[in-house]
């Protein structure tokens, strides 16, 4: 609980969201290479909103939608949006089980750091992770790939022609 810097910005975090980590900044760096002014970004499993908000702060003129199943995580993301973004920046957060409640809209970029730990491996994680991070932000089901398959399978309906999907993946996936 408290504040965690990510991409140079101070994000509020608590027990309802995964604490942003430096490794995830690589995802933001790669996404920035793909973005153009005016592009739209969809952040699946947004958590604290750190990925989406960092992209919107670093690439002016883009708009973004962050999606998460957890209402409590979305409250954290919204708090970060109000703290970091100008009111003029087009950014919304939606509660949805992945694409279920997402309106039909096209995005230039779908980005995600989904849960990717195999269920059986969670108990082997370091105590500061397994005991203090939300399990729903960690558990990628039996093989750790559940969310990748779901997002990749459905995202094509939401991508603009020539759009991109970028994921953070585990070191062993």
Task: Map each language-model feature to its residues.
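Conserved AdoMet
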Residues: 1-33
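Conserved Class I SAM-dependent methyltransferase catalytic core
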Residues: 142-173
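Mobile active-site "lid"/loop adjacent to the S-adenosyl-L-methionine
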Residues: 116-146
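Short glycine/threonine-rich catalytic loop with a Thr-x-Gly-x-Asp
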Residues: 20, 47, 144
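Class I S-adenosylmethionine-dependent transferase superfamily signal
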Residues: 31, 55, 129, 151, ...
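Conserved SAM/SAH cofactor-binding pocket of Class I
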Residues: 25-124
